[in-house]
C-alpha cells in the first residue's frame, strides 16, 4: 500500500498572490507545509504540484519534490488528479498548500479510515465550532454526518439550524459544547482511482451553488468519512492571515 501526499500550489492566488512563497520563520510557506506533511507516519512520499516556475525553483532550493502541471486547471482537485494519474500510489492525500501549521497527526487521522475500510473511497476531517462567528460565517464550511461519521452535507450556511435556540445563540453556547456542531477541515484522502473518476465528473448543482467541490462527490453517491480532529491549523488566505501565522510561529518558539 503506497500513500502519496500531493500539495497543490499556485502563485496566482486571487486574494493573496504569491502566498505560497511568503516567508514565515525564515522559510517559504510551502516548505513548512511540505516538511510537516513528510512527518506524517502513514505518508510514503510528498509531491508539490504547481504550474509556476517560481514555486518550482523554491522547492528545488529546499530539496523537495515538485511536479509541473498544466496552467489551465480551474481547481486544486484538477491539478491533483493530473499528478495522480501519473502515479502508482494506492491512496492520494490532498494537503492544502496554505496551511503552514498543519499537524502531521491530522494527516494520519484522515488516512486511517481508508486503511480500515477497503470499501471507503474518500475521507476528510472536521473540528468543533467554538464561537458564534464561525457558525454564522459563510467562509467557515459546516458539516453534518450520520451516526457512522459519513458526511450528510457540507454548507456555508449555519448547519444544523437550531430552530428553537436561534434567538439565544451566543459564544458560550458553542464554547461549552451545549451546541455541538462542526466545521470542515479541508484535507482530503482519496483512493487514486476514485480521485481520477471524481475529477472527471461534471460539476453539480449543489457544488456550484455552494462553491464546494466535495458536494460533487455526495451528489454522485460517494460516501465521505469525516473524522473529528482536535488539532487546529491556520489557513493563509490573506495578508492578515499571514500575520496571524507568523505570530503563532513566534508563540510556539517562545514556549
Swiss-Prot record:
Compartment list: Cytoplasm
Keywords per UniProt: Cytoplasm, Lipopolysaccharide biosynthesis, Nucleotidyltransferase, Transferase
Predominant cellular place of this UniProt entry's protein: cytoplasm
GO biological process: CMP-keto-3-deoxy-D-manno-octulosonic acid biosynthetic process; lipopolysaccharide biosynthetic process
Keyword Transferase: yes
Enzyme class: transferase
InterPro entries (alphabetical): Cytidylyl_trans (IPR003329), KdsB (IPR004528), Nucleotide-diphossugar_trans (IPR029044)
Any single Gene Ontology cellular-component annotation: cytosol
GO MF terms, alphabetically ordered: 3-deoxy-manno-octulosonate cytidylyltransferase activity
CDD domains: CMP-KDO-Synthetase
Catalyzed reaction equations: 3-deoxy-alpha-D-manno-oct-2-ulosonate + CTP = CMP-3-deoxy-beta-D-manno-octulosonate + diphosphate
Pfam families: CTP_transf_3
Superkingdom assignment: Bacteria
Pathway: Nucleotide-sugar biosynthesis; CMP-3-deoxy-D-manno-octulosonate biosynthesis; CMP-3-deoxy-D-manno-octulosonate from 3-deoxy-D-manno-octulosonate and CTP: step 1/1; Bacterial outer membrane biogenesis; lipopolysaccharide biosynthesis
Matches recorded under SUPFAM superfamilies: Nucleotide-diphospho-sugar transferases
Transferase listed as a keyword: yes
Record function comment: Activates KDO (a required 8-carbon sugar) for incorporation into bacterial lipopolysaccharide in Gram-negative bacteria.
PANTHER family in UniProt: 3-DEOXY-MANNO-OCTULOSONATE CYTIDYLYLTRANSFERASE, 3-DEOXY-MANNO-OCTULOSONATE CYTIDYLYLTRANSFERASE, MITOCHONDRIAL
Family: Belongs to the KdsB family.
Name of the molecule in the record: 3-deoxy-manno-octulosonate cytidylyltransferase
Amino acid at each position: 500500500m503506497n500513500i502519496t501526499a500531493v500539495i497543490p500550489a499556485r502563485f496566482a492566488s486571487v486574494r493573496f498572490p504569491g502566498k505560497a512563497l511568503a516567508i514565515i520563520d525564515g522559510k517559504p510557506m510551502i516548505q513548512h507545509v511540505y516538511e510537516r506533511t513528510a512527518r506524517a507516519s502513514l505518508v510514503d512520499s510528498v509531491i508539490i504540484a504547481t504550474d509556476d516556475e517560481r514555486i518550482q525553483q523554491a522547492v528545488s532550493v529546499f530539496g523537495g519534490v515538485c511536479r509541473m502541471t498544466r496552467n489551465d486547471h480551474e481547481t486544486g482537485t484538477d491539478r491533483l488528479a493530473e499528478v495522480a494519474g501519473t502515479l502508482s500510489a494506492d491512496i492520494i492525500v490532498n494537503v492544502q498548500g496554505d496551511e503552514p501549521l498543519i499537524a502531521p497527526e491530522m494527516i494520519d487521522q484522515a488516512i486511517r479510515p481508508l486503511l480500515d475500510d477497503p470499501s471507503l473511497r474518500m475521507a476528510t476531517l472536521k473540528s468543533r465550532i467554538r464561537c458564534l462567528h464561525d457558525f454564522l460565517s459563510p467562509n467557515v464550511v459546516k458539516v453534518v454526518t450520520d451516526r457512522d461519521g459519513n458526511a450528510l452535507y457540507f454548507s456555508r450556511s449555519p448547519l444544523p439550524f437550531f430552530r428553537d435556540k436561534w434567538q439565544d445563540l451566543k459564544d458560550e453556547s458553542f464554547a461549552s459544547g451545549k451546541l455541538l456542531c462542526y466545521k470542515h477541515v479541508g484535507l482530503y484522502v482519496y483512493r487514486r482511482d476514485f480521485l481520477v473518476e471524481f475529477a472527471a465528473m461534471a460539476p453539480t448543482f449543489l457544488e456550484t451553488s455552494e462553491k464546494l467541490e466535495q458536494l460533487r462527490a455526495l451528489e454522485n453517491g460517494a460516501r465521505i468519512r469525516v473524522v473529528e480532529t482536535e488539532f487546529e491549523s491556520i489557513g493563509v488566505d490573506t495578508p492578515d492571515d499571514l500575520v496571524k501565522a507568523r505570530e503563532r510561529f513566534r508563540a510556539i518558539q517562545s514556549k
